[in-house]
């Protein structure tokens, strides 16, 4: 079933940790919805900042947010102006003290979400779906990926019948739990309708650690 399930969810508690690191006996639902509001606001506010994922930790009346991005300068802004605006907005949104930590992604071509979003943007600019997939694969393998698979589906090239085309290079062992596999999907809005983009990137094997194993229990 490794080819059906989300590769990230399958590995939580084995080699991956949770992106929401908190527990609540009461008000769990309201805190979960607050997390969703925070993530949605950050996605909308930082659409051009190449944000890969957001980690949220809670302690008493404080929220610690880690933003993983390929463009930290755009998130922080000149003299920290942009991150201060973001912090103030999240403070008012949650009525809690918010601390933001910006973490730079140094190899953006090995991050599945950033690769998928880049392919989607190029498709919206009417680039060839074959060319953009092959270019993404070449860049990822050149920078150190062990394997990569991409898939674009929909009315490709304006065809009347929707179909899916995928390209791959190297190996992507979806059944191996210790395999560090990034997965993401994105959508491209074209004149012929939406195109779906999926990306799997295999970055090598990771040995399970005690902390991540306990986090899955």
Curated annotation (Swiss-Prot):
<feature type="domain" description="KH type-2">
    <location>
        <begin position="38"/>
        <end position="106"/>
    </location>
</feature>
<dbReference type="GO" id="GO:0003729">
    <property type="term" value="F:mRNA binding"/>
</dbReference>
<comment type="similarity">
    <text>Belongs to the universal ribosomal protein uS3 family.</text>
</comment>
<dbReference type="GO" id="GO:0006412">
    <property type="term" value="P:translation"/>
</dbReference>
<keyword id="KW-0694">RNA-binding</keyword>
<dbReference type="InterPro" id="IPR005704">
    <property type="entry name" value="Ribosomal_uS3_bac-typ"/>
</dbReference>
<dbReference type="InterPro" id="IPR036419">
    <property type="entry name" value="Ribosomal_S3_C_sf"/>
</dbReference>
<dbReference type="GO" id="GO:0003735">
    <property type="term" value="F:structural constituent of ribosome"/>
</dbReference>
<dbReference type="GO" id="GO:0019843">
    <property type="term" value="F:rRNA binding"/>
</dbReference>
<keyword id="KW-0687">Ribonucleoprotein</keyword>
<dbReference type="Pfam" id="PF07650">
    <property type="entry name" value="KH_2"/>
</dbReference>
<protein>
    <recommendedName>
        <fullName>Small ribosomal subunit protein uS3</fullName>
    </recommendedName>
</protein>
<keyword id="KW-0699">rRNA-binding</keyword>
<dbReference type="InterPro" id="IPR004044">
    <property type="entry name" value="KH_dom_type_2"/>
</dbReference>
<comment type="function">
    <text>Binds the lower part of the 30S subunit head. Binds mRNA in the 70S ribosome, positioning it for translation.</text>
</comment>
<dbReference type="GO" id="GO:0022627">
    <property type="term" value="C:cytosolic small ribosomal subunit"/>
</dbReference>
<keyword id="KW-0689">Ribosomal protein</keyword>
<dbReference type="Pfam" id="PF00189">
    <property type="entry name" value="Ribosomal_S3_C"/>
</dbReference>
<dbReference type="InterPro" id="IPR009019">
    <property type="entry name" value="KH_sf_prok-type"/>
</dbReference>
<dbReference type="InterPro" id="IPR015946">
    <property type="entry name" value="KH_dom-like_a/b"/>
</dbReference>
<dbReference type="InterPro" id="IPR004087">
    <property type="entry name" value="KH_dom"/>
</dbReference>
<dbReference type="InterPro" id="IPR001351">
    <property type="entry name" value="Ribosomal_uS3_C"/>
</dbReference>
<comment type="subunit">
    <text>Part of the 30S ribosomal subunit. Forms a tight complex with proteins S10 and S14.</text>
</comment>
């Amino acid at each position: 079933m490794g080819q059906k399930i989300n590769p990230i969810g399958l590995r939580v508690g084995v080699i991956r940790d949770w992106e929401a690191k908190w527990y609540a006996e009461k008000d769990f639902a309201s805190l979960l919805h607050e997390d969703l509001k925070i993530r949605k606001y950050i996605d909308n506010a930082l659409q051009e900042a190449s944000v890969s994922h957001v980690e949220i930790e809670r302690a008493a009346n404080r929220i610690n947010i880690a933003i993983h991005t390929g463009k930290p300068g755009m998130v922080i802004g000149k003299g920290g102006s942009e991150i201060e605006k973001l912090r103030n907005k999240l403070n008012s949104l949650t009525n809690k003290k918010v601390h933001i930590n910006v973490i730079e992604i140094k190899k953006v071509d090995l991050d599945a979400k950033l690769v998928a979003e880049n392919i989607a943007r190029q498709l919206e600019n009417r680039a060839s779906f074959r060319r953009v997939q092959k270019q993404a694969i070449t860049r990822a393998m050149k920078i150190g990926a062990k394997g990569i698979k991409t898939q674009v589906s929909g009315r490709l090239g304006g065809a009347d019948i929707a179909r899916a085309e995928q390209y791959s290079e190297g190996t992507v062992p979806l059944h191996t739990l210790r395999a560090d596999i990034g997965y993401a999907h994105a959508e491209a809005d074209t004149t012929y309708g939406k195109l779906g983009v999926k990306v799997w990137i295999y970055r090598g094997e990771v040995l399970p650690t005690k902390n991540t194993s306990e986090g899955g229990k």
